[in-house]
Design a protein with these regions (language model features):
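Acidic-and-aromatic substrate-binding clefts and catalytic sites of carbohydrate-active enzymes
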Residues: 13-21, 43-51, 76-82, 105-110, ...
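His/Asp/Glu-enriched short active-site or ligand-binding loop at hydrolase and phosphoryl-transfer sites
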Residues: 71, 81, 86-122, 157-168
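C-terminal domain-boundary segment and adjacent tail
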Residues: 3-9, 18-20, 137-201
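Alpha-helical scaffolding segments of alpha/beta enzyme cores, especially the outer helices
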Residues: 23-30, 55, 59-62, 85-92, ...
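Active-site beta->alpha N-cap acidic-glycine motif
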Residues: 1-48, 52-66
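Short low-complexity, flexible loop/linker segments enriched in glycine and/or proline
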Residues: 25-28, 51-53, 113-115, 173-179
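Structural recognition of the beta-strand scaffold that forms the well-ordered cores
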Residues: 9-13, 34-39, 73-76, 96-100, ...
Length: 201
């Protein structure tokens, strides 16, 4: 559908979904869209230990690479739950953690028209829209998406991938050409969170 509309987007796949439907994952890349990881099993990473966090991220990216040939370090953490400790535990595995500022509300199952209105009424330049493809939401999202695209284009917006969106921000480094390929410097010093201190001042 996106290809027919002449637009591209960024898809965040869970590793288990890429394993279950490798042809679909490959078709996303072949259509010129960007791909990122939603970890492996779409379970929340917040509060998990270092080993679990790294395993979820690594298995997710490996499954995506196996299905698509694309190596990505771009993460949309499940439920947008990713805390400071998660960052410290995975800084060498993740280039950027992406959230959204417009939730289409597709998961509420209020209908395609309501979903479309939520997006169009909330839109301002640079916004990131969350659309999901779960079994419960997929049919409604597929119905709403052409209307959303047509509405945004009619309002003068251009729909782009996250990496292309970042390139429009002149405050960011010119070297940041793709969010999916940034890595930590080899000599990076990993921060340590302070130990809990019960003393008061």
């Amino acid at each position: 559908m996106l290809k027919e509309k002449g637009v591209t987007a960024t898809f965040f796949l869970s590793g288990d979904a890429a394993e279950a439907s490798p042809a679909t994952a490959k078709a996303i890349v072949d259509a010129g869209c960007e791909i990122g990881s939603n970890s492996y099993s779409d379970d929340s990473l917040k509060g998990e230990d270092r080993e679990t966090v790294r395993k979820q991220i690594t298995k997710g990216t490996e499954a995506i690479k196996s299905a698509t040939g694309v190596e990505t370090m771009l993460l949309r953490a499940p439920y947008a739950a990713f805390d400071e400790q998660n960052w410290i535990d995975s800084m060498d595995l993740v280039s950027a953690v992406v959230s959204w500022n417009i939730d289409s509300g597709d998961w509420l199952l209020n209908g395609a028209d309501e979903q479309m209105s939520t997006v169009l009424d909330s839109m301002t330049p640079g916004n990131i829209v969350l659309l999901t493809d779960s079994d419960e939401c997929a049919e409604q999202t597929l119905e709403a998406l052409p209307q959303i695209i047509d509405g945004l284009v009619a309002d003068g917006y251009k729909i782009v991938t996250l990496s292309d969106l970042v390139k429009t921000d002149t405050a960011l480094s010119k070297k940041l050409t793709s969010l999916t390929k940034v890595s930590m410097p080899k000599n990076a010093v990993f921060p340590q969170l302070p130990e809990d201190d019960d003393t008061t001042e």
